[in-house]
Design a protein with these regions (language model features):
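Helix-turn-helix
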Residues: 1-20, 24
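A short structural micro-motif
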Residues: 3, 108-112, 182
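Short, basic, alpha-helical segments at the C-terminal edge of helix-turn-helix-like DNA-binding modules
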Residues: 28-32
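Hydrophobic alpha-helical connector segments
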Residues: 34-80, 96, 103-106
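Mid-protein regulatory/catalytic core that forms ligand/cofactor-binding pockets
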Residues: 83-119, 123, 129-130
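C-terminal peripheral helix-coil segments that are non-catalytic and often amphipathic
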Residues: 91, 119-186
């Protein structure tokens, strides 16, 4: 604020309170990534691409994650995204219940993967790797398993090599497609 020649409180001339700033920040990130403006002939591919773009946006802005609980459905950009997703789900023939369930299930899954990816990115930086490609992430996971004794945890020890090699991008796609298939069949 000093560099701009204003006080730290000057922002409140434009926003009612801290919550209003947070809502606008979340909505700005949602709007900047334009997650729904893409063409896919197949509604399943359209939906996957939309959630993959949301995931990418949140991974690029991890500071927004703590703000999602209060601000995610209140801004115009966020509401536009939600409305368009629901429109596509209904257009695909899903019932109201299925559309609502699929929207929330995919949102919860996507946010959960972002939390894990952000933690892996933070861990990679701590061990001296600034990027988060699959090889770096796998090494980081492997190192985290090697840093603790797994003898009291035989199942983790048995699966550690496989857990370290999970390809997050491929896993995200496969899981989103499986969730869509499961909800659409219910």
């Amino acid at each position: 604020s000093a560099r701009l020649g204003v006080t730290a409180m000057a922002i409140y001339r434009y926003f009612k309170n801290k919550a209003a700033i947070e809502h606008e920040l979340v909505d700005l990130v949602v709007g900047d990534y334009d997650v729904i403006n893409h063409n896919r002939d197949d509604w399943v591919e359209w939906l996957y691409t939309t959630y993959a773009k949301m995931r990418h946006a949140l991974c690029n802005h991890p500071g927004v994650m703590p703000l999602l609980d209060n601000a995610s459905y209140q801004g115009g950009n966020a509401l536009t995204v939600m409305d368009r997703i629901l429109q596509e789900l209904r257009r695909a023939g899903l019932s109201e219940r299925q559309a609502a369930q699929l929207f929330h299930t995919l949102m919860a899954y996507m946010v959960g993967t972002v939390v894990l990816m952000n933690e892996e990115a933070r861990r990679a930086i701590v061990v001296g790797k600034s990027n988060t490609n699959t090889a770096v992430t796998s090494r980081s996971r492997k190192l985290s398993f090697e840093m603790v004794s797994l003898s009291p945890y035989p199942h983790i020890a048995e699966l550690a090599p496989h857990l370290a090699q999970v390809d997050a991008e491929r896993q995200f796609r496969e899981s989103v497609l499986q969730i869509i298939k499961s909800v659409a069949a219910s």
